[in-house]
Every structure is written in C-alpha cells, then in structure tokens.
C-alpha cells in the first residue's frame, strides 16, 4: 500500500498530477485544493490512498491526513465510490463536508456533482456521528488564510497552476485577477477553486 509520495512534480493536469519518485512516475488523482499546492519542477510530498479494482490500481492524493481520512470515510456510504468522494472534495473543503453532514444540510451536499437528495440524506444518516472531530484535525495551513491585500505570490502561484492545468495565461490572468480583487482574503487553494469555477463556465 502506497501511503505517501515524495518527488518531483512532472506535470499537473485537470484532475491529476504526475510525481516522479526514483525514476518512476506516479499519476495521482486529486482535488483542485491539492493540485493548487503543487508546482511543476519542484519537490513535493503528498499523502495517498490506493483504490484497487479488478482491472486498475488508482492513487488519490491529499495535502493533509484529515482530507485523506474524509475521502476514505465518504466511501463507507453505500453507492458512494472514489470518484464521488473526490468530487465532494473538489467542491467543499474537508471542514465544510464535515459541517454540512453534522448539520444535516442535505441541500448543500446536493451541490456535489452526482449527489442527489437520496444520496445526500444517506450521507447524513451514515456519517453524522462519524465526522465529529474532523474540523479539529485540519492543520492551520489548510484553513482559510486572511489577508488585507492581494498577495502577489498567491496570484503568481495560482496562475502557474492554471497554466499547468491547460489554460492560457491570456485567458486565466484576467479571471484570476478579478477573483483576487473581489476576495483578497482567499488562500491559494481557494483562489484556484474559484478561478476554475469561473473558467469552467466559459467553456
């Protein structure tokens, strides 16, 4: 079982990244929050969990243990597989998922692609008592970071991530600039998610 990877980030795609470790490239599927913390050509460490099927072995990557545990926990719900668990973490932070489930907010959970009313209610029933403590398990680095002005480093890093995801700088920069101007308190991962949301509506 591969539980973590440390190596050079070779490429970043729309939903995955390739990390080379000792000459071997591993494709890791991940949510935008995780991909947004990676930079091509730089060293990175990601926590992983492997999902084994009859014809495939797939690695999923995370920036912190709380996110990885939530990914595994979500799959304990009948009918909720790894793709849906990853979709949940692409829409919400681990903290948000725990809060929506604990609060019985089925309407919020239905914002996850592929989750209807019945699945949302099942998630609440099955996991309401199991998400206690998840908010406390998220490291400070993963919490929203407040700032008074737009951090230039955040803009540069998010722009690089967007270009790595296949968007041209000409298209991505105006969208990202607007996102950060309207919400300068956003962290890198939050800004990436917001920019991807806007860029997605333009396709």
UniProtKB/Swiss-Prot annotation:
Gene3D superfamilies recorded: 5' to 3' exonuclease, C-terminal subdomain, DNA helicase RuvA subunit, C-terminal domain, Nucleic acid-binding proteins
InterPro entries linked: DNA_helicase_Holl-junc_RuvA_I, NA-bd_OB-fold, RuvA, RuvA_2-like, RuvA_C, RuvA_C_sf
Subcellular location: Cytoplasm
A GO CC annotation given for this chain: cytoplasm
Region feature (Domain II): 64-142
Region (Domain I): 1-63
Annotated region (Flexible linker), positions in chain: 143-150
Name used for this protein in its record: Holliday junction branch migration complex subunit RuvA
Species, as recorded: Corynebacterium diphtheriae (strain ATCC 700971 / NCTC 13129 / Biotype gravis)
The encoding gene: ruvA
């Amino acid at each position: 079982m591969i539980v973590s990877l440390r190596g050079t980030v070779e490429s970043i795609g729309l939903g995955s990244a390739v990390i080379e470790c000792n000459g071997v490239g591993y494709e890791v599927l991940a949510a935008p929050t995780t991909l947004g913390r990676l930079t091509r050509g730089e060293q990175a460490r990601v926590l992983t969990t492997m999902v084994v099927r009859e014809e495939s072995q797939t690695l999923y990557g995370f920036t912190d243990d709380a996110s990885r545990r939530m990914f595994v926990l979500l799959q304990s719900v009948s009918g909720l597989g790894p793709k849906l668990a990853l979709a949940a973490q692409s829409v919400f932070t681990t903290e948000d998922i725990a809060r929506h489930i604990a609060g019985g907010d089925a309407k919020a959970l239905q914002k996850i692609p592929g989750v209807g009313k019945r699945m949302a209610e099942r998630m609440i029933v099955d996991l309401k008592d199991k998400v206690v403590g998840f908010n406390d398990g998220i490291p400070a680095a993963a919490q929203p970071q407040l700032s008074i002005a737009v951090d230039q480093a955040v803009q540069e890093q998010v722009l690089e991530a967007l270009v790595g995801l296949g968007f041209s700088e000409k298209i991505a920069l105006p969208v990202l600039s607007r996102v950060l101007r309207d919400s300068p308190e956003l962290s890198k991962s939050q800004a990436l998610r917001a920019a991807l949301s806007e860029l997605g509506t333009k396709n």
